[in-house]
Every structure is written in C-alpha cells, then in structure tokens.
Amino acid sequence: MLPLTWDQLYEACNSCQGCELAKTRTNCVFGTGNKEADILFVGEAPGEQEDLTGTPFVGRAGQLLDKYLYAVDIAREDVYIANILKCRPPKNRDPLPAEEDACIDYLREQVRLIKPKIIVCLGRIAAMRLIKPDFKISKEHGTWFEKGNFVMTAVYHPAALLRDPRRKEEMLADMQQIKKKLDSLKDNV
C-alpha cells in the first residue's frame, strides 16, 4: 500500500473488498479520535453496534473503556481508537488470519499518519498480532514492549471485563500505568 492521506486511506478502507467480511458489513469501521493522538488504542474487530454506526467502541465495551479513560484522566477526544479488522466478523467470532492480513495495512497506515507515542492493544487478539504471536494476556497485560518507534502494552479487552468483572482492578492498574507512561513521555519532549 502506497503512503496515503487520511481521506485516501478512509476511501480505500470503505471500498475494500479484500476479504469475505466486506460482503456482510453494514459499515467499514475505520477508527475515531484525535488524528494527532499520543495514544492509539487498538481492538480486534467491530461488534454489532460498531458495524451499525461505523464507529469503534460505542457499545457496552466502549462505554466501559470510556469509564476507564475518565478514571485516569484521559479524554477520549485525546486518543485515537481503531481495530485490526475494519469489518465485523459474523457472530463476533475471532478474526481469521486471512482477514487480519487483509486489514493490517490500513492499521499500519493509521499508525504512520497518527505517529502515537503509545500503542495500547485492547485484548489478546490485538496483542498477539501487534506485540508477539504467543502473547498471554493473563500474564503479560500491563507489560511494556518497545517495537520500532513505539512503546506498546496490552490490557484486557473491555468486553472480557464485562464477562469477567474480577479483572477490573487489574485493568484500572494497567490504565494508571498507561497514564503514568504518557506523562513521562510528554515530560521528556
């Protein structure tokens, strides 16, 4: 994929027919937020509400993410939120490798255009794709990794916390560390 502008990338994503998911999507869920964000949050794929609205993390999981952002004094307007997949898999199943491969260049271009200081993977699927293939979310959440020009970490996916609320304190601690890392990176500029 050639380097694109925001508008070109958005149009390319909206017209994408790179995998079977394009046939069943209501909307391409490109991403939302500050295009100059210091933090990029990356989930795995849109859910039903996201497919209907074309905006990531607007359902119950997104509302929970908003609460965590608020709790650590990070405004949603100051971050960018995207997914690895831009189209919803049927019945919210895990993305297939071929689907990830079809979409990953869109995310790479988003990263290139945003130039975030921190990339936060929301859940194991995003972490396995972006940090390392054998990533174990239960053991490695909140751990920092350096990849290229970015520092990266992963937290539990908000949807997982809705299913298992026992992890909510760990999520809050991870989000506090993200805020602390962001503040330290801003201080070093």
Residue map of PLM features:
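A polyanion-binding, active-site-adjacent surface
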Residues: M1-V189
